[in-house]
Amino acid sequence: MLNPKMKWFALLLLTSFQAQAHTDQLTQISFQIGLLHPLTGIDHLLAMLLIGMTAALTPKTKLSLPLVFSFGLLIGTLATGWLNAAMNVEPWVVGSVVVFAALVWGKTRINPPLQVGLVGIFAIAHGAAHGMALPSTPDVASTAGLLIGSLLLQSIGFAVGQRDCLRKTLALDTRMTS
């Protein structure tokens, strides 16, 4: 059993800062910034989760929505400078959350090709917003981190959506058998 001082020391070790003894520290930091960025803004966090949920709830677009969103995110991130001058992306980001929420809660039904197109447009806006928020010009490491973080959130949303589908299916089965 650890004495109380050792417990505090162990806790301190767990919370220590990253060692900066590596030659590729800028790449590591850049990757971490990209990875954490989708988690730090509520609009981006909600959008990624809702995309995953929408994909789970829409059988015809299960794979295409996350892939189109990720590709649009990449395009938007890489075209940040041009998109920044061409449009104000923040209203598009907020609008995407509203549209994705309507799709999840079933208040809006649109055909799958239009749904995929909307997701692509909103993804480009999200990518531009992410690219503008990064501390420097988007590089390979930060962009890879951004895509991985976004796909992780979409996967969580997909799992939640699948669980919801299963729950609804089981509820229908119990109603039919009783």
Task: Give short role names for the model-derived ranges.
Residues 2-11, 17-178:
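Membrane metalloprotein/metal-transporter helix-bundle signature
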